[in-house]
Amino acid sequence: MSSRDASLTPLKAVVIDDPPLRQTPEPFDEQSAYNPQSPIAIDFGSSKLRAGFVNHATPTHIFPNALTKFRDRKLNKNFTFVGNDTLLDQAVRSQSRSPFDGPFVTNWNLTEEILDYTFHHLGVVPDNGIPNPILLTERLATVQSQRTNWYQILFETYNVPGVTFGIDSLFSFYNYNPSGNKTGLVISCGHEDTNVIPVVDGAGILTDAKRINWGGHQAVDYLNDLMALKYPYFPTKMSYLQYETMYKDYCYVSRNYDEDIEKILTLENLDTNDVVVEAPFTEVLQPQKTEEELRIQAEKRKETGKRLQEQARLKRMEKLVQKQEEFEYFSKVRDQLIDEPKKKVLSVLQNAGFDDERDFKKYLHSLEQSLKKAQMVEAEDDSHLDEMNEDKTAQKFDLLDIADEDLNEDQIKEKRKQRFLKASQDARQKAKEEKERVAKEEEEKKLKEQQWRETDLNGWIKDKRLKLNKLIKRRKEKLKLRDEMKDRKSQVSQNRMKNLASLAEDNVKQGAKRNRHQATIDNDPNDTFGANDEDWLIYTDITQNPEAFEEALEYEYKDIVELERLLLEHDPNFTEEDTLEAQYDWRNSILHLFLRGPRPHDSENIHEQHQMHLNVERIRVPEVIFQPTMGGQDQAGICELSETILLKKFGSQPGKLSQTSIDMVNNVLITGGNAKVPGLKERIVKEFTGFLPTGTNITVNMSSDPSLDAWKGMAALARNEEQYRKTVISKKEYEEYGPEYIKEHKLGNTKYFED
């Protein structure tokens, strides 16, 4: 890590675990305070159920609308857990089921058991059924089959005296306007959908109401999908409850989405708006070693390293000697054939395994380049090794000039050893001479460069910049090619396989014409790769030797760094931001900022492996109710729907609102559990200000807990005896008119929508 990165303060990571389990079961209401005449209001939502007697200010029971049937194998008994009781145990919570499938109740057996649980905890004393009247919420434009099933459960199963059905968002509006004759506009953000309903004189105008098929449930699923695409190899699977926590705690509605999305992935913005969430995991702690154990381990690694270095040096020396002998042999062959007839030259070369003279020259050139490279590597070894070897072997070369016939078996073995040591010494000496020659050439080159720079600085800078750009471009192409090679489905990889197949076919046709594997260590000596620069591209295309490819990249990088150093020193217009390192700096990578936030990423850190960064998603997910197409919904957003209602309905004209629309604008209500997302009210005020005529007064209301508005509206209606009586369907009416009967009132659905 660079010093610049080390100075950055680490971002705080928030561990997102499943919500904690409850320690106590759902409490029971006192039966002593039970009043059989008091209506019971039940907001039967797809996420939460809120229930209580209407003489209370708030519902006394709020719990998840879910049920678990759990079998205890030890006790060999079945248990039923409902609502908050499903949160008492992790195994029970993981098996909980909802009676809803999307916005509709589909499991009526679960519904009946949940109602049993609700009435029991409310302290209801049964008297041939439930003696209390019931107020129940339903969705906008609910289907007849849903209400029919509710009729059957309430009247036939529970024998209730009367029931009131009403739209949840209109109950919420009634809570703010208990007189029942106010005009306004309701924006209901629910768990399964979002509704915009105009209200005139206290009655919902359902023919002009609009629904968006997007709610809190879809928002959490959308966040789940986005994070799964963002981190496809995340080590653990996050649960729905964890994503729900992330959505509720960290997502917010942007006041100006288009502007914010443009600048959200900047370092300055991410420092304050990037949220790091971490999935819980069990960290395996390595046992701590004592200082003595660490010292012994370090010494062992050091000894092992020395042994491996020595083995590598000896192996490298063997290769160098072999290449040197081969080069000297073929150089003599080349010199001997200088004045010979072409026919004889071709015959000699073909006997040696070459196709023609051109093939021989290419091979010799490749061998010379490989030898120079090996000599340079050998020359970089410590000089004291050479001196030690020279001192030890100077007096042991006396057997080299004696014929094998005059030596015994042990002396012959010693002679072979001396021959190898002598060849090694000669090779090192030649490597030294080559190194000195190269150093001298480099010094002369530096002097020429200096003279050129002093006489023509602009030309020198132009030349260096051109060389630097070529090197960087070539390096990027190679890196891109390497990455594509790793993808078996890429076009480059497929072309490579075709080339390999073609090469294999050619080799089969040629047969074993040339067999000189003993001539060189690197590769088949007939492979003249390296004679032309284009051969390197072919080599990288086939990638038969990835080590050589990486080595070539390393040499290229050194050349790039050296050119950048010269330009930084002598070119006033070349800065650190122009260097190759700056181009690969994580600060300049939008992808890094998107995935890893405003800090460098350590892939070896176990905590960072389990972390996700919320940045774009924080405003993208809530934005869907304003732009449903972002979530795959071919619908208009809430502000566009509101604009149509206010500017094109109820007698409004372009540039002039009708009195009804003015009354609606002055009484806008935001309600529903999904309305808790921060910034929603401010965004709606801004959007309304944008499309309404200049100077229009806007009043937007939203309670501190909009999820309770519907229940409070039901309680307020029940306390108004005159209005409540008009909404109740008695059991007698149900028996007389049947399950298709619906009593129309200002807060409920109607049987037909009339144009």
UniProtKB/Swiss-Prot annotation:
Entry keyword set = Isopeptide bond, Nucleus, Phosphoprotein, Transcription, Transcription regulation, Ubl conjugation
- Reply yes or no: does the keyword Transcription regulation apply: yes
Where is region (Disordered) located?
418-444
Which GO MF terms are attached to this record?
enzyme regulator activity
BP GO annotations = chromatin remodeling; DNA repair; regulation of DNA-templated transcription
Against InterPro entries, the record matches this protein to: Actin (IPR004000), ATPase_NBD (IPR043129)
PTM annotation (Phosphoserine): residues: 7, 383
Coiled coil residues, start to end: none
The organism's place on the tree of life at top rank: Eukaryota
List where Basic and acidic residues composition bias occurs: 425-444
Q: Which GO terms describe its cellular component?
A: cytoplasm; Ino80 complex; nucleus
Positions carrying Phosphothreonine are 24
User: Which Gene3D superfamilies does its entry note?
Assistant: 3.30.420.40, Actin, Chain A, domain 4
Name the principal localization, coarsely classed: nucleus
Subcellular location, in the record's words? Answer: Nucleus
Respond yes or no to whether keyword Lipoprotein is given for this record: no
The residues joined by the cross-link Glycyl lysine isopeptide (Lys-Gly) (interchain with G-Cter in ubiquitin) are 12
What exactly does this protein do?
A: Probably involved in transcription regulation via its interaction with the INO80 complex, a chromatin remodeling complex.
- Assembly and oligomerization: Component of the chromatin-remodeling INO80 complex, at least composed of ARP4, ARP5, ARP8, RVB1, RVB2, TAF14, NHP10, IES1, IES3, IES4, IES6, ACT1, IES2, IES5 and INO80.
An additional note in the Swiss-Prot or TrEMBL entry is: Present with 2170 molecules/cell in log phase SD medium.
The family classification in the record reads: Belongs to the actin family.
> What is the protein named?
Actin-related protein 5
**Lineage of this protein's species?**
Eukaryota, Fungi, Dikarya, Ascomycota, Saccharomycotina
